[in-house]
């Protein structure tokens, strides 16, 4: 059953933030610009993250402006039936600041040629930004909403090493400081249920994030995809996944630790069904969001509660249910 009522959404919703910021529904269009990662090509490691599906992938830095325009045009056309009027171009696949600076600029420049595009989001790693990259990205803040999305996953270096991330928590802190100095919005990706992490470790990662000057977060569920190192570990019985109920309760716990100014961009896994091994329940995105909202109501919980904030302090909570994030 879908949660209804003014108190249904007890967190700062990214959808609501965008609606208030732009006055209409805003849709993210994902772009694959053909990048790779430094823990795949040997710069810091090989093989990529142990949870990442590498099958059939080959970097393609020959993707240029024309292909970016085509992807954006297709995305805008596909979103029209949903009545989205404005769009954020999201460079999502792999590490989208890992390339020559002039190549990066030529790709980012293309998104602003679409009048419907009001923002740019760039997915990257904390070890793949420097002052030159930050200066380039900061230049676009005059044109619209600009986000750098950092894959952190965990604040514990031993976990980062175990999943072959190839960077440290300190490198993440350095990247946040550098990014914040130029006024670029920061979104952080975390994963609940990583091997070797208990509840306290999962919560500690988010306690640390709550003290940082970040603007958004994506909370992912660890899931197992085909053709990954973790798929082999899972088959060997070396990985225990969170149950649906455990994941829901952990998300509610995490939300209580985050201040209301951090908008929640995602609270679920994002796995292609054809490569997903487990858990199959993570495909039920809208149902999981409903479960989280029910759990918040049952526990009389809301974002920031553990920090002393009240429901009235949530700037982007919904007075009616939002579309799934």
Language-model-detected regions and their locations in the chain:
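Auxiliary Fe-S-binding modules of radical SAM enzymes
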Residues: 1-16, 25-27, 216, 224-325
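Core AdoMet radical
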Residues: 55-72, 79-101, 116-129, 145-171, ...
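N-terminal [4Fe-4S]-dependent radical SAM core
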Residues: 1-88, 324-325
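Acidic (Asp/Glu)-rich catalytic clusters
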Residues: 79-81, 108-115, 135-145, 177-181
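Conserved C-terminal portion of the radical SAM core fold
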Residues: 170-229, 245-268
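Distinct, well-ordered alpha-helical segments
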Residues: 101-109, 130-139, 202
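Structural recognition of alpha->loop->beta junctions
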Residues: 49, 111-117, 204-219, 288-303
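Hydrophobic faces of well-ordered beta-strands that scaffold small-molecule active sites
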Residues: 27-31, 87-89, 120-122, 146-150, ...
């Amino acid at each position: 059953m879908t949660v209804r009522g003014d108190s249904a959404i007890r967190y700062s919703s990214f959808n609501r933030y965008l609606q208030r910021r732009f006055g209409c529904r805003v849709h993210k269009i994902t772009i694959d610009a053909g990048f790779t990662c430094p823990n795949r090509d040997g710069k810091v490691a090989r093989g990529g993250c142990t949870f990442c599906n590498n099958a059939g992938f080959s970097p393609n830095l020959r993707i240029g402006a024309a292909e970016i325009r085509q992807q954006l045009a297709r995305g805008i056309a596909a979103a029209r039936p949903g009545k989205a009027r404005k769009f954020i171009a999201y460079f999502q696949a792999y590490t989208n600041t890992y390339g020559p600076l002039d190549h990066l600029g030529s790709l980012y420049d293309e998104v602003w040629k679409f009048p419907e595009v009001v923002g740019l989001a760039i997915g990257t790693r904390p070890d793949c930004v420097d002052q030159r990259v930050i200066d380039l990205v900061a230049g676009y803040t005059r044109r619209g909403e600009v986000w750098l999305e950092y894959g952190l996953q965990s604040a514990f270096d031993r976990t980062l090493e175990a999943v072959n991330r190839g960077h440290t928590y300190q490198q993440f802190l350095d990247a946040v400081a550098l990014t914040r100095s130029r006024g670029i919005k920061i979104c952080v990706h975390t994963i609940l249920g990583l091997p070797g992490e208990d509840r306290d470790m999962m919560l500690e990662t988010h306690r640390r994030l709550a003290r940082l000057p970040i603007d958004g977060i994506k909370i992912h569920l660890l899931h197992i995809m085909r053709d990954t190192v973790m798929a082999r570990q899972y088959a060997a019985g070396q990985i225990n996944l969170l149950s649906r109920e455990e994941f829901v309760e952990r998300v509610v716990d995490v939300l209580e630790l985050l201040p209301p100014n951090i908008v929640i961009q995602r609270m679920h896994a994002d796995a292609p069904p054809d490569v997903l091994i487990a858990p199959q329940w993570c495909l039920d995105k809208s149902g999981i969001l409903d479960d989280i909202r029910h759990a918040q109501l049952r526990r009389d919980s809301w974002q920031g509660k553990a920090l002393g904030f009240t429901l009235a302090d949530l700037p982007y909570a919904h007075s009616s249910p939002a579309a799934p994030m």
